[in-house]
Amino acid sequence: MEETVMKPYVIGLDLGGTNSVFGIVDSRGDIKVTTAVKTQVYDKVEDYVDACVDALQVIIDQVGGIEKIKSMGIGAPNGNYYSGTIEFAPNLKWGHDGIVPLAKMFSDKLGIPVALTNDANAAALGEMTYGAARGMKNFIEITLGTGVGSGIVIN
């Protein structure tokens, strides 16, 4: 409870093939501030992460600084929750040829814990917790954007 009071916010990143949208939210899921970065203008992941951190710093300052941020979660195409990596994502210029340790890259830059998962699974979890699927035990979330994906919840 004390850490929630001291660090009341988390950062969410919806990493898409075209755009990356960031939000800082409180413990109730209320969005406090947002920003976005064009994903596809960066050929190298290092340049992408630097641009994201620069954009994030502006909204982090708006909520009182990094000391108010508990952690960050990333939903990404071909995201691997267990390794914190994006693996061979065909809709990302810098992600289609291999494995990208994106969670570690953001954690190293921001100094906070970062978790990463598949974007469709993250969307399903969000709907189950805050959205139209609240209270449902079985459903499928279909995501459409630069790519297509699905998150399946059973029991």
Q: Residues of each region from the PLM?
A:
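Glycine/GP-enriched mid-protein hinge/lid loop-to-helix segment characteristic of carbohydrate kinases
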Residues: E2-K7, G23-V25, T34-A36, Q40-E46, ...
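Short glycine-rich, Thr/Ser-proximal phosphate-binding strand/loop in the N-terminal lobe
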Residues: V5-D54, E67, I86-F88
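Conserved S-adenosyl-L-methionine
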Residues: D14-G16, G73, T143-G145
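Conserved A3 ("GATE") glycine/threonine-rich loop of ANL adenylate-forming enzymes
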Residues: T18-N19, A122, T146-G149
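Glycine-rich phosphate-binding loop and adjoining helix at the ATP-binding site
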Residues: V45-V53, K70-M72, N78-N138
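Alpha-helix termini
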Residues: I60-I66, G131-A133
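Short glycine-rich anion-binding loops that position phosphate/pyrophosphate groups of nucleotides
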Residues: P77-N80, G145-G147
